[in-house]
């Protein structure tokens, strides 16, 4: 873990702690790089979820089926919000959502999904000059709800953050 605090454009605290993962003895250094996408799930979705809990809109003991109609008819229905946040709900660690939209062997985007210019069917900006099909979000949530559950033991999963983001928007 790394913590950096800046005030008025100046770094006032910068410290690294621990090891790079639970299997490694390699210490975290200030030069280590992180996947920003994983950080944004926690820094954007988690504060909104905390606010919803603080305002009694969501209870950590509620199940996904209680807060999300799409979860009711899935194997995710009885998962408690608390279990999901603690990464103990049995959710898969990761789903390669892009696998259906990209030819991984030659690093080519499938044109059924992507376009260089924004059009009626491709409104979601991926990066400059690349837009993805509008239904991709529905596909992602469908893939999450259809995915199998594992054992209820600690295993990091970002899938809950996708669900919470959708419910909190």
Predicted regions and their residues:
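Short, conserved catalytic-motif segment at the N-terminal edge
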Residues: 1-36, 57-59, 137-147
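Glycine-rich, acidic and aromatic/proline-enriched surface loops and short helix-turn segments
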Residues: 8-10, 87-90, 129-135
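Solvent-exposed loop/turn segments at secondary-structure junctions
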Residues: 11, 18, 22, 42, ...
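Active-site helix/loop module of the DD-peptidase/beta-lactamase fold
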Residues: 30, 35-39, 54-104, 145-146, ...
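Catalytic-site signature segments of enzymes, centered on catalytic residues
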Residues: 33, 95-100, 104-169
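Short alpha-helical patches at coil-to-helix transitions and adjacent helical residues
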Residues: 39-46, 78, 156-161
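Short glycine/serine- and small hydrophobic-enriched flexible loop segments
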Residues: 47-57, 162-169
């Amino acid at each position: 873990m790394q913590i950096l605090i800046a005030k008025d454009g100046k770094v006032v605290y910068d410290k690294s702690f621990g090891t790079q993962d639970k299997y490694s003895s390699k210490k975290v250094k200030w030069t280590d790089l992180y996947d920003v996408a994983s950080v944004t799930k926690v820094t954007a979705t988690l504060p909104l979820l905390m606010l919803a809990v603080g305002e009694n809109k969501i209870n950590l003991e509620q199940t996904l089926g209680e807060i999300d109609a799409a979860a009711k008819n899935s194997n995710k229905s009885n998962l408690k919000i608390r279990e999901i946040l603690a990464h103990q709900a049995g959710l898969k660690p990761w789903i390669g959502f892009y696998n259906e939209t990209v030819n991984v062997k030659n690093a080519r985007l499938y044109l059924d999904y992507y376009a260089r210019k924004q059009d009626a069917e491709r409104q979601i900006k991926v990066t400059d000059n690349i837009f993805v099909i509008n239904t991709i979000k529905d596909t992602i949530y469908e893939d999450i709800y259809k995915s199998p559950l594992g054992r209820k033991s600690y295993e990091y999963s970002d899938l809950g953050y996708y669900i919470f983001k959708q419910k909190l928007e």
